[in-house]
From Swiss-Prot:
Pfam families: DUF2463. This is UPF0328 protein ECU02_0070. It comes from the Eukaryota. It comes from Encephalitozoon cuniculi (strain GB-M1). Belongs to the UPF0328 family.
Length: 314
């Protein structure tokens, strides 16, 4: 009798704790991506350029929101994927989990490192525009899609959304892809990469040249299709992403479409891989910018100092 009376309150407390955890996690998933996009944008327009130059705390708050969201979500994904990688499975699946673990850990480390480095940067108007508007619109979509629309469970790795959520997720993905294309083109990152291919890296041949030329052509086509100035497009894109994510959250809350447990369809795997590649490209750019900031801060000469941030209309 006494044991029964003792165990019952314990079970109630445990259920209450689980319920609170679920409520906190749901609230965080709803509010964090929206705040990480909207608040840095508001800070950019509220404060003048010289305030960023004089106040490192203001710079810290601006980059802390999107990068801390990245740290928390990728850490949660790493924790989930790490538990799955410890389960008995074949060598191929275990290797896949270890590769994903390495990538997720890399994303977490880069995000933490960048919080400090970006705060050290000398923020003119272009830098403020990049860190406040461009960076969140690049960084938030992949981690948001990973945390809400993808599965890292063993044997079920892939894109799992159904119904109208698929359409909204694809729009978010396309919007971020265009952002990455424009930033890479404007920063001349692709040009530097292409310049390394023919004579310096040793990778020559018709197939490689065709691939590089195709990439350059795609960048040029996208650049011509978008008739807005880049700075206006980045601002519109950040607003559009905010709206898409808000719609996605509202549909998830009021009209949930459910999740697909059969993730072996090729298109679902392709969407998952696309999100992963997009995240890798975003963090490659972040590393590139971080190295440039360190070079500028330490006055070290180097070719990375030629990297240009996206332009902003003053």
């Amino acid at each position: 009798m006494n044991i029964a009376h003792i165990s019952e309150p314990h079970e109630i407390n445990e259920q209450h704790h689980i319920k609170n955890q679920l409520h906190w996690r749901t609230s965080f998933n709803c509010l964090a991506p929206l705040i990480s996009i909207a608040l840095p944008m508001l800070i950019h327009f509220i404060f003048e350029e010289d305030r960023f130059e004089e106040n490192p705390f203001l710079r810290l708050i601006t980059v802390l929101l999107p990068l801390s969201y990245s740290v928390i979500q990728y850490s949660a994904l790493l924790h989930t994927n790490w538990k799955e990688s410890t389960k008995p499975e074949d060598t191929t699946h275990k290797a896949l989990h270890y590769i994903l673990n390495l990538l997720l850990l890399t994303f977490v480390v880069i995000s933490i490192f960048s919080i400090t480095v970006f705060t050290l940067d000398k923020w003119d108007y272009a830098a403020s525009f990049f860190y406040s508007i461009v960076l969140p619109s690049l960084l938030i979509p992949p981690v948001y899609l990973f945390s809400t629309s993808c599965s890292f469970i063993s044997g079920q790795i892939g894109f799992r959304d159904t119904g109208t959520d698929i359409f909204i997720d694809i729009l978010i993905l396309i919007c971020d892809i265009v952002n990455v294309v424009l930033v890479y083109k404007e920063s001349e990152f692709l040009s530097v990469f292409c310049g390394l291919i023919p004579g310096q890296t040793g990778f020559t041949g018709t197939g490689t040249n065709i691939l590089i030329n195709t990439l350059v052509s795609v960048f040029d086509i996208v650049n011509r299709v978008l008739v807005y100035k880049e700075s206006k497009y980045y601002l519109y894109s950040a607003i559009i992403l905010f709206v898409f994510i808000l719609i996605r959250i509202l549909t998830e809350k009021h009209c949930p479409s459910g999740k697909n447990s059969l993730l072996t369809a090729p298109w679902r795997i392709a969407v998952f891989v696309s999100i992963l590649i997009l995240a890798i490209l975003v963090f490659t750019l972040i590393v590139h910018v971080s190295i440039k900031v360190l070079n500028d801060h330490l006055n070290l000469p180097g070719e990375l100092n030629s990297l240009r941030l996206p332009k902003a209309d003053e």
